[in-house]
Amino acid sequence: MAATFFGEVVKAPCRAGTEDEEEEEEEEGRRETPEDREVRQQLARKREVRLLRRQTKTSLEVSLLEKYPCSKFIIAIGNNAVAFLSSFVMNSGVWEEVGCAKLWNEWCRTADTTHLSSTEAFCGFYHLKSNPSVFLCQCSCYVAEDQQYQWLEKVFGSCPRKNMQITILTCRHVTDYKTLESTGSLPSPFLKALKTQNFKDPACCPLLEQPNIVHDLPAAVLSYCQVWKIPAILYLCYTDVMKLDLITVEAFKPILSTRSLKGLVKNISQSTEILKKLMTTNEIQSNIYT
């Protein structure tokens, strides 16, 4: 009961029934129709990560590292890390492509790894012909959060071997680096490392300090290795230039002295020249006036 003015008594409306009706309407709105279900399933199929054979372009029945024995796996994620491996590692030996990942999301659509331009997104897997247990992944595409577990299962499998060593290379913008100093005073680019508990080799640079964190696919791979007790190290290059950049690529050079990459690079000066040619080609392709 409620009073509107002195002496008058009226009934106040009860909200109990109204709230029940609102909840029923919300439930009806949330109830999935057959059309909604079909759209959701189509989108889920479209977002599936597929690992294809190089020759036949058919899907692998088992994960990549279940099919091929692996002792060393180097993963480059992002354009600058990919350019580093292309110039310094892949040009120092004969590498054979064993597969490629096909995926689609809001940020990228992977292209075939043959006849690529420098702007196309791709994710290719290779092994060294002279030592097929040495694997390399070049991933220039964005793997969305809901696709990362799929990617890990397609590459490592549900019960991975522990007798291999993983090295991950990637970049982040220097503004993501948390420090008491001003980021403007930091000597960008610079390397930091983060490793799993089972990785016993020394890192070639300082370890990443708390409260800094890693993101996206590099974080997913490192977490996966930590859970499965696989020795793994992530080398993270903080830079103020996220596009393909010569100085940023060369910031990875200290990694060449590590056990992971030692012996894979034959001629550093020749590889540097190859890198410069790659950068020149990229600048020409990026110039809309040429």
UniProtKB/Swiss-Prot annotation:
Residues the record lists as N6-acetyllysine modifications: 266
Positions of modified residues (N-acetylalanine): 2
Keywords: Acetylation, Chaperone, Cytoplasm, Endoplasmic reticulum, Phosphoprotein
Principal cellular location given in the protein's record: cytoplasm
InterPro entries: Proteasome_assmbl_chp_1
GO molecular function, one term: proteasome binding
Keyword Acetylation: yes
Oligomeric form and interacting partners: Forms a heterodimer with PSMG2. The PSMG1-PSMG2 heterodimer interacts directly with the PSMA5 and PSMA7 proteasome alpha subunits.
Entry similarity comment: Belongs to the PSMG1 family.
Protein name: Proteasome assembly chaperone 1
Upper taxonomic lineage: Eukaryota, Metazoa, Chordata, Craniata, Vertebrata
